[in-house]
């Protein structure tokens, strides 16, 4: 391990002039000690006394030397190793398992740190892998510390850790943002307790090579004196910019690696390795194949061979052959000659990796990095709540991290596969996941942490204290989902957690829908182990069950043998077993349940028969069933985590164990199927879709639609899916289509609330009980367009009790809906549930409109709002440019008329219009189908048209100003 610049004098910046030539690590340790009471420092009174930001370039030792020297503040390095350390620990978080494990092992084996012994004074703690002392320097994934902050009290955290080092703090994963929110809140609470809390308050150090120091210092309220800049690598890195961009980065990466290999044939094996970044495993496999083919050409030319090592998170978790090859010394590795089949020494390793190798990982033999410049991450689009893996150009900060993998021990070379001009055009920093994905599974944690700071005990969006708050549309969608799931309710003072919400908020990582599905399982007397299995399958299989198959050519027919391995005994001897099971279940998730049951049966069989090496036999079983062994193990682990989560909050994870679907008989099977489907429906009711026979598409209440076809089940009328996925139409073009992830057919199994699923254009019909529209017309729809400042958010509209509605206009509340499922839900959830039936957010950038009912124009008063009238379904035809125009044109006295003038609706909308405008002379027999005709009417009412658009014969948009 090379000597980092933190240990070399003269690399400090942003420090007093007299300290610029200090050894950086000495200056940092002195700076910290000056603020510790045990070293003569004052008792901390503000965050500035407990937060330090170190921006240290790659290769400086911020991940290795810094944590060790910080730990030595607590334990003298000359202390005998046999003396057990009993003080508080230092935790250093890493964004990935690989870096946490590797750093701990490297430090434990380094001659530079003889006092750091793996398992005694240094260790690692990750979800899949753990080897750590009870007290000492602990490298952990961010998720480990996040879970502790979520479940432990402030005093418990303070008694465990003296220092928290957040390495790679620039990473903007949801968990890291939430962790920083927790840390800041904890520090503030302990400081508010005075000297009692402040004496043991942990010291927080944020480190990164590309951190935005201004943003983070502003967030923590600290000044420039709390920011230390350190120069990075000691050796130069030469960047080889290409003259032209490539349209096939995988092929170009292979050609570049081969060129490097041939032109540097005299490299020493200890200074020769190549690292190539790829956005995903599919690209890694393809590039590895090309490189292995290149090895064939090298063998024919009698040139030294390359050892190809594909690395991703799965390889690390399994510690497979490729990962072991990465950790081994090059002199101990061999490669098979494709011509002679003999093994020989490779000249170099070519490591083909995802972003797991992007940060914190030091490969001392690495000399070259090839970067195609792409990054793949999940993006979610609201309010449709559709998401998927999207490949985009990596931010400059990520590219700098990739470049920083070399130049640590000797000079390195960086080969971008894009021009310098392209690099200069891409964003400097990556977008935080809370922007690209929304709050997701951490939403309830955000709610709880925000409520803690609110004296009234309510959730207010403007009080969210995060580096970047959730976007308005994502926040609106999350609130809607939480209300529908019965976890949030709207009290007199604002949004509050329900009793179920309070329980759900204690889960460390369950989403709103996952928590709701578990709660429904207890109410409907379902086997909770089945619920946990279904949720685990959804999590691991991601888009569809075929992702569990270990085959390049995946299709549903290949699942047959795996599904049949787990079905109840009474179904095993029927003809056309899989086809009939598929028809009987009509459910991807239940088929996934049976796949896992088969895997469990295999585990029990091998254990009961006392076979040697159970894992080996399970791998062979999975190969026969064409299943990925790693995926099945992940389902097992995820399922165990869910059951543990339930047990931790006091719920019985083995509730109704005897009612498992796999143990059903002919009399109980369909009843248990219906029960599980009911739980799925209640969890994912916002993702219910009805079949439109005219359009041959499935449509939902949020206006989106998609096609779905099943070879056996023909066009079911109602389906539910855990999520809507964005799937690429082709590999050549940046185009995506919507498709369901997993499908559960509800027809005949669940009593679906059709009112809840009504599309927007049918909203007036939700007001059931109106037989004679002329005598008792439905109330018109009032729409509000809000301009949001920062994170200000509130639901528009009045409660149903305030709307003076006639009894016949109230929505019929079905017997099987939310309020009847869990008896302890507060009764005001009924009102909220009713409002959600007709309240949905639709936004473009900072614009949002909300649908609700109204009686008189004067009844509705909203700050920063513009009153709009019309049918919002037609607003789908407005472009972003149209909305931008409205954003600037509309004032508090402006109106947007959005009318869908299909035949038979004119009378209803004219009636609504004359009520809204107080103008009772509009002729109801007129056929208004053109913009000029409408303009004439509104001019008579004293309005001036300022914007208009007519996308079709029956749809038009007009903005009027009074």
From Swiss-Prot:
InterPro entries: DEAD/DEAH_box_helicase_dom (IPR011545), DNA/RNA_helicase_DEAH_CS (IPR002464), Helicase_ATP-bd (IPR014001), Helicase_C-like (IPR001650), P-loop_NTPase (IPR027417), SAM-dependent_MTases_sf (IPR029063). One of its GO terms (cellular component) is membrane. Residues 253-459 form the Helicase C-terminal domain. It is found in: Host membrane; Virion. The chain crosses the membrane at residues 521-541. GO terms for molecular function: ATP binding; ATP hydrolysis activity; RNA binding; RNA helicase activity. Gene3D superfamilies: P-loop containing nucleotide triphosphate hydrolases, Vaccinia Virus protein VP39. PROSITE patterns: DEAH_ATP_HELICASE, HELICASE_ATP_BIND_1, HELICASE_CTER. It is an enzyme of class 3 (hydrolase). Residues 43-229 form the Helicase ATP-binding domain. Keywords: ATP-binding, Helicase, Host membrane, Hydrolase, Late protein, Membrane, Nucleotide-binding, Transmembrane, Transmembrane helix, Virion. It catalyses: ATP + H2O = ADP + phosphate + H(+). Its EC number is 3.6.4.13. It is a single-pass membrane protein. Induction: Expressed in the late phase of the viral replicative cycle. SUPFAM superfamilies: P-loop containing nucleoside triphosphate hydrolases, S-adenosyl-L-methionine-dependent methyltransferases. ATP binds at residues 56-63. A motif (DEAH box) lies at residues 167-170. The keyword Cell division does not apply. It comes from the Viruses. PANTHER family: ATP-DEPENDENT RNA HELICASE, PRE-MRNA-SPLICING FACTOR ATP-DEPENDENT RNA HELICASE PRP16. Belongs to the DEAD box helicase family. DEAH subfamily. This is Putative RNA helicase B962L. It comes from African swine fever virus (strain Badajoz 1971 Vero-adapted) (Ba71V).
């Amino acid at each position: 391990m090379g000597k980092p610049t933190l240990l070399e004098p003269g690399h400090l910046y942003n420090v007093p002039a007299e300290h610029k030539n200090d050894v950086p690590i000495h200056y940092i340790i002195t700076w910290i000690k000056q603020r510790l009471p045990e070293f003569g420092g004052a008792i901390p009174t503000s965050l500035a006394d407990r937060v330090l930001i170190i921006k240290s370039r790659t290769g400086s030792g911020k991940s290795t030397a810094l944590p060790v020297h910080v730990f030595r503040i607590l334990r003298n390095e000359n202390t005998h190793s046999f003396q057990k350390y009993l003080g508080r620990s230092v935790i250093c978080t890493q964004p990935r398992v690989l870096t946490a494990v590797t750093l701990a092992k490297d430090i434990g084996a380094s001659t530079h740190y003889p006092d750091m012994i793996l398992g005694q004074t240094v260790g690692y703690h990750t979800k899949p892998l753990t080897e750590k002392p009870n007290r000492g320097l602990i490298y952990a994934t961010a998720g480990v510390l996040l879970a502790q902050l979520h479940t432990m009290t402030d005093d418990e955290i303070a008694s465990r850790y003296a220092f928290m080092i957040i390495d790679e703090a620039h990473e903007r994963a949801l968990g890291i943002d939430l962790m920083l929110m927790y840390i800041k809140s904890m520090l503030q609470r302990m400081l508010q307790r005075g000297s009692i809390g402040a004496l043991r308050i942990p010291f927080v150090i944020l480190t990164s090579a590309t951190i935005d120091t201004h943003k983070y210092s502003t967030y923590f309220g600290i000044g420039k004196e709390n920011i230390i800049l350190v120069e990075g690598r000691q050796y130069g890195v030469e960047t080889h910019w290409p003259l032209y961009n490539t349209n096939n980065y995988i092929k170009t990466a292979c050609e570049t690696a081969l060129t490097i290999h041939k032109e540097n044939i005299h490299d020493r094996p200890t200074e020769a390795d190549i690292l190539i970044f790829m956005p995903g495993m599919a690209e890694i496999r393809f590039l590895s194949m090309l490189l292995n083919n290149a090895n064939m050409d090298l063998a024919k030319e009698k040139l030294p061979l390359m050892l190809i090592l594909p690395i991703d998170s799965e390889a690390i978790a399994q510690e497979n052959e490729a990962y072991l090859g990465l950790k081994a010394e090059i002199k101990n590795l061999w490669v098979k000659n494709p011509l002679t089949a003999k093994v020989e020494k490779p000249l170099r390793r070519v490591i083909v990796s995802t972003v797991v190798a992007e940060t914190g990982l030091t490969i001392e033999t690495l000399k070259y990095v090839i970067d195609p410049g792409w990054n793949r991450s999940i993006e979610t689009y609201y309010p449709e709540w559709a998401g998927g893996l999207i490949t985009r150009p990596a931010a400059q900060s990520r590219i700098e991290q990739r470049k920083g993998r070399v130049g640590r021990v000797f000079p390195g070379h960086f080969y971008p596969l894009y021009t310098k001009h392209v690099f200069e055009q891409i964003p400097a920093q990556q977008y935080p996941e809370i922007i690209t994905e929304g709050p997701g599974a951490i939403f309830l944690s955000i709610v709880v942490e925000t409520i803690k700071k609110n004296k009234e005990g309510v959730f207010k969006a403007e009080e969210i204290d995060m580096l970047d708050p959730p976007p308005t549309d994502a926040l609106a969608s999350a609130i809607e989902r939480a209300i529908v799931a019965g976890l949030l309710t709207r009290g007199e003072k604002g949004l509050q957690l329900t009793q179920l919400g309070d329980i759900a908020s204690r889960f460390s990582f369950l989403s709103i829908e996952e928590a709701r599905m578990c709660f429904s399982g207890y109410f409907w007397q379902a086997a909770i182990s089945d619920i946990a299995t279904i949720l685990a399958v959804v999590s691991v299989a991601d888009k569809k069950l075929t992702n569990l198959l270990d085959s390049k050519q995946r299709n549903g027919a290949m699942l047959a043998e795996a599904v049949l391995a787990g079905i109840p005994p009474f179904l095993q001897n029927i003809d056309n077993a899989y086809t009939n099971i598929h028809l009987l279940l009509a459910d991807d998730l239940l088929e996934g349940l049976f796949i896992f049951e088969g895997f469990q049966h295999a585990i029990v069989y091998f254990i009961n028969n006392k076979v040697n090496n159970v894992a080996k036999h399970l791998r062979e079983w999975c190969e026969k069933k064409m299943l990925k062994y790693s995926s099945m193990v992940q389902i097992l682990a995820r399922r165990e985590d869910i059951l543990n989560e339930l047990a931790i909050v006091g719920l019985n994870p083995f509730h109704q164990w005897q009612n498992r679907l796999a143990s059903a008989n002919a009399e109980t099977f369909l009843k248990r199927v219906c029960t599980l489907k009911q739980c799925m429906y209640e969890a994912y009711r916002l993702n219910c879709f009805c079949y439109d026979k005219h359009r041959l598409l499935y449509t939902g209440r949020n206006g989106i639609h998609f096609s779905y076809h099943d070879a056996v089940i023909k066009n079911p009328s109602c389906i539910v899916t855990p999520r809507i996925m964005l799937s690429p139409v082709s590999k050549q073009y940046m185009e995506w289509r919507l498709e369901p992830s997993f499908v559960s057919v509800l027809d005949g199994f669940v009593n679906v609330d059709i009112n809840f699923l009504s599309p927007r254009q049918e909203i007036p019909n939700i007001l059931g009980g109106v037989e004679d529209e002329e005598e008792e017309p439905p109330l018109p729809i009032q729409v509000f367009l809000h301009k949001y400042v920062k994170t200000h958010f509130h639901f528009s509209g009045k409660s149903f009790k305030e709307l003076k509605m006639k009894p016949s206009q109230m929505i019929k509340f079905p017997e099987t809906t939310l309020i009847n499922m869990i008896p302890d839900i507060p009764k005001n959830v009924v009102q909220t549930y009713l409002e959600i039936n007709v309240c949905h957010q639709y936004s473009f950038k900072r614009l949002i409109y909300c649908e609700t009912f109204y009686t008189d124009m004067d009844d509705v008063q909203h700050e920063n709002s513009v009153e709009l009238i019309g049918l919002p379904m037609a607003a789908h035809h407005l472009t972003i440019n149209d909305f931008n125009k409205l954003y600037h044109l509309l004032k508090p006295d402006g109106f947007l008329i959005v009318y869908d003038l299909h035949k038979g609706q004119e009378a209803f909308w004219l009636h609504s219009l004359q009520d809204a405008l107080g103008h009772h002379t509009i002729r109801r027999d007129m056929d208004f189908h053109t913009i000029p005709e409408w303009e004439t009417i509104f001019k008579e009412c004293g309005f001036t048209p300022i914007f208009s658009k007519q996308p079709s014969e029956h749809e038009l948009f007009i903005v009027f100003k009074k």
